[in-house]
Amino acid sequence: MRAIGVFEYITLRAVLACATALLIGLVAGPRVIRRLTEMKIGQAVRAYGPESHLVKTGTPTMGGALILIAIAISTLLWADWINRFVWVVLLVTFGFGWIGWMDDYRKVVYRDPEGMPARQKFFWQATIGLVAAVYLAFAVSAPANTELWPLFKAWVGSGFTMPLPTRADLIVPFFKSVSYPLGVLGFVALTWAVIVGTSNAVNLTDGLDGLAIMPTVMVGSALGIFAYVVGRVDYSKYLLFPYIPGAAELMVLCAAIGGAGLAFLWFNAYPAQVFMGDVGALALGGALGTIAVIVRQEIVLFIMGGVFVVETLSVMVQVTWFKYTKRKYGQGRRIFRMAPLHHHFEVGGWKETQVVVRFWIITMMLVLVGLSTLKLR
């Protein structure tokens, strides 16, 4: 009985979840790649991308499905099935994965490098993000599922003005006991932006072999530590974080993401044998955003995921400036040689592996900064 009792420890189950996902990915990887190759599910490279990427044409894509399968099996094996946060993260992950799958399918079957129309993709992302945001506004605030509906009714009965408990406040890192109450509408708006924004940010970063998956593993692992802290009464009290009942179980899911991500990196490292595609990138980004919201570390996610943030900003700045100058001068001008930012460095002479490893190093440093907020407050 004592041997069985050790499985009550979240830390042990997290280690086992990581190992299980890693093993599933390593064992199933070659078969999945072989099957994708047989089905001719190859990457269609954009004509306006770097010329060096033309050799990647035909490389199997949609390998993110392998990541999602490994995460799901490992999580269901080792996580608590009645934990609401585990389920909401899984649902968001697979919801965004479905969007990515449809996008990849269009690219592969119709040989359309652009994939699903941007407006259609954004509509589904916005819908899933909004549903998750509304649920989390009350799930994070209520200690148990039985209190969700009463809390919602109380908010409606107050004329939509009732504030949320302090555990739902926006936490400002590096400052002791500094947080800002968001209210239901503010919480929903911020959560929606974090989930949808992170999903797209990871997707934009996924442009070089191994570039997106390793930062995802590092950021996801760090969020697992935050989940463990805020999910325990003793640690959260000692470190001055809000106590979120049930959040500690997300450490198991984060560990599964880490294991599955490392397994995928085995095959995605340069020269990549398979790409994750939108099915993987959108899903993993959605997962990171959702977990960060639950553990109340939206700003820390912004810090640790700095590579994702800068990649996204580079695209936004490039597009905005190009449209503005085209309208004003009749010819569009660019700030970067090419966007996202990793292509800017490629065109500037950096080797693909140099860009990837340097972005990994930057992410590792940013993650350490994020983890330092556990104590430096």
Swiss-Prot record:
Its main location: membrane. GO terms for cellular component: plasma membrane. GO terms for molecular function: metal ion binding; phospho-N-acetylmuramoyl-pentapeptide-transferase activity; UDP-N-acetylmuramoyl-L-alanyl-D-glutamyl-meso-2,6-diaminopimelyl-D-alanyl-D-alanine:undecaprenyl-phosphate transferase activity. It is a multi-pass membrane protein. Pathway: Cell wall biogenesis; peptidoglycan biosynthesis. Its EC number is 2.7.8.13. Its cofactor is Mg(2+). The keyword Cell membrane applies. It catalyses: UDP-N-acetyl-alpha-D-muramoyl-L-alanyl-gamma-D-glutamyl-meso-2,6-diaminopimeloyl-D-alanyl-D-alanine + di-trans,octa-cis-undecaprenyl phosphate = di-trans,octa-cis-undecaprenyl diphospho-N-acetyl-alpha-D-muramoyl-L-alanyl-D-glutamyl-meso-2,6-diaminopimeloyl-D-alanyl-D-alanine + UMP. It comes from the Bacteria. InterPro entries: Glycosyl_transferase_4, PNAcMuramoyl-5peptid_Trfase, PNAcMuramoyl-5peptid_Trfase_CS. Keywords: Cell cycle, Cell division, Cell inner membrane, Cell membrane, Cell shape, Cell wall biogenesis/degradation, Magnesium, Membrane, Metal-binding, Peptidoglycan synthesis, Transferase, Transmembrane, Transmembrane helix. One of its GO terms (biological process) is peptidoglycan biosynthetic process. It is found in: Cell inner membrane. It holds the Pfam family Glycos_transf_4. The chain crosses the membrane at residues 9-29, 62-82, 85-105, 122-142, 155-175, 178-198, 210-230, 247-267, 274-294, 299-319, 354-374. Belongs to the glycosyltransferase 4 family. MraY subfamily. Catalyzes the initial step of the lipid cycle reactions in the biosynthesis of the cell wall peptidoglycan: transfers peptidoglycan precursor phospho-MurNAc-pentapeptide from UDP-MurNAc-pentapeptide onto the lipid carrier undecaprenyl phosphate, yielding undecaprenyl-pyrophosphoryl-MurNAc-pentapeptide, known as lipid I. This is Phospho-N-acetylmuramoyl-pentapeptide-transferase.
